[in-house]
């Protein structure tokens, strides 16, 4: 498994194509690829704000993503999430747990655990963690859990099982998000399969998943 990052300062479409083409020659079964994010107050963000680094423009970043998707598909990699591609049977079970909003355990300083109803975050520093400092606890309200399950589930190419969402949270997503989902469906960004009761991003919508 390898991770790739696109939209780097100074990176152009041709250099990205060479990196993707090189990845296809490696003996890997899983590829994760992420667009670079300039997190506020990080050194890279400050360099961008001062003009020391110039981020890739949105159009180029979309072209990079398109090339990745097309090349992966042509080389036996199935896209199963916005940023993840795998050979048959090689999907990341670890990450699928997150996208399906299932319980998980985190160990070590600053690690987070989730039991389906609450989140527990361990002490941030190693020193405090080794001292046995109590973790912070966050109770997840029903509406919050619903929203988190929806946006995480929509990252998957097969989208969200609306019947499962209703069973877990008692909320009919189609009714609750009627106005928003109708608008995105009309724009060709979301797809509603009434028979299977699944809501998913379209191929075009995958490019704008964070905004949706």
Residue ranges and their predicted role:
Residues 171-186:
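Short amphipathic alpha-helical interaction segments
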Residues 81, 185-196:
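A short, conserved structural fragment
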Residues 204-212:
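Short, amphipathic alpha-helical interaction segments positioned at domain boundaries
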Residues 197-202:
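Minor-groove-contacting beta-hairpin "wing" of winged helix-turn-helix DNA-binding domains
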Residues 1-171:
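C-terminal scaffold of the Radical SAM
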Residues 162-163, 175, 192:
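Extended hydrophobic-aromatic, low-complexity segments
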């Amino acid at each position: 498994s390898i991770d790739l990052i696109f939209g780097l300062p100074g990176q152009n479409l041709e250099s990205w194509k060479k990196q993707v083409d090189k990845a296809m020659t490696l003996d890997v079964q899983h590829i994760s690829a992420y667009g670079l994010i300039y997190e506020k107050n990080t050194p890279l963000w400050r360099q961008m704000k001062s003009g020391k680094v110039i981020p890739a423009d949105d159009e180029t970043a979309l072209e990079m993503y398109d090339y990745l998707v097309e090349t992966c598909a042509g080389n036996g990699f199935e896209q199963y999430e916005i940023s993840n591609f795998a050979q048959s049977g090689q999907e990341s079970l670890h990450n699928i747990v997150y996208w399906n909003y299932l319980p998980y355990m985190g160990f070590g300083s600053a690690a987070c655990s989730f039991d389906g109803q609450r989140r527990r975050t361990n002490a941030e520093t190693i020193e405090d963690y080794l001292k046995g400092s109590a973790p912070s606890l966050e109770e997840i309200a029903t509406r919050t859990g619903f929203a988190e399950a929806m946006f995480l589930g929509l990252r998957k190419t097969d989208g969200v099982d609306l019947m499962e969402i209703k069973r877990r949270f008692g909320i009919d997503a189609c009714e609750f998000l009627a106005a928003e989902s109708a608008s995105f469906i009309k724009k060709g960004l979301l797809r509603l399969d009434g028979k299977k009761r699944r809501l998913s991003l379209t191929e075009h919508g995958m490019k704008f998943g964070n905004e949706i």
